[in-house]
Design a protein with these regions (language model features):
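N-terminal single-pass transmembrane signal-anchor helix
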Residues: 1-29
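Extracellular/periplasmic head regions of type IV pilus-like filament subunits
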Residues: 57-143
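Alpha-helical interaction segments
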Residues: 18-19, 45, 52, 83, ...
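A generic fold-level signal
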Residues: 3, 40, 137-139
């Protein structure tokens, strides 16, 4: 009886098929994780808005931001780093203030390369200061809450804060909302 062995070609074909299947699984897994992080970002925004509204109900206004030091972005409060001081004034309304699931920078803050920059941002605009009114026309102050980047499809996130023809935070952030007082 003659023993049958696998030929080199047969072994290479099996290895190639395993490689293709592994790649397909990894791509699917990576895409699923990205979608989950985007969903988490939206859920976090909802959580933060609820906490901000509770703060406003108690104090009569939204909190002023605490610019994030040398990591700040144009006086915005951002969640970069460990997020320990991000929106610390919400501590009595949240067990822990959410931060972006990736929460990282790709070098200096450059929102033109947002595909590698992930953070949450908050800014309070005082309507009595014409520099910060941005043509919004609100009779009172307002706040903007945002996150920089979605990982899957930014077009599905329709929340883009705009005021008149002057201010469009959608140019800086994939998701942004205005909270008028």
């Amino acid at each position: 009886m003659k023993k049958r062995y696998f030929t080199l070609i047969e072994l290479l074909v099996v290895i190639a098929v395993i490689g293709v299947l592994t790649t397909m699984v990894m791509v699917y897994y990576s895409s699923t994780r990205k979608k989950a992080r985007d969903t988490q970002r939206i859920n976090d925004m909802t959580t933060i808005v609820k906490a901000l509204n509770s703060y406003k109900s108690e104090k009569g206004h939204y909190p002023n931001e605490t610019p994030s030091g040398s990591m700040g972005y144009n006086n915005w409060e951002i969640s970069i780093g460990d997020g320990a001081n991000f929106m610390e004034y919400l501590e009595s309304y949240l067990p822990k203030t959410p931060v972006d699931p990736l929460n990282r920078l790709a070098g200096a803050i450059d929102l033109s390369s947002r595909d590698k920059t992930f953070f949450y941002a908050y800014h309070h605009y005082d309507s009595t200061d014409p520099v910060y009114n941005h043509g919004c026309g609100f009779a009172s102050s307002y706040a903007v809450l945002a996150f920089t980047t979605t990982e899957v499809n930014s077009n599905k996130f329709k929340e883009r804060a705009t005021c008149g023809t002057f201010a469009d935070w959608g140019n800086e952030f994939d998701y942004s909302i205005i909270l008028p007082e």
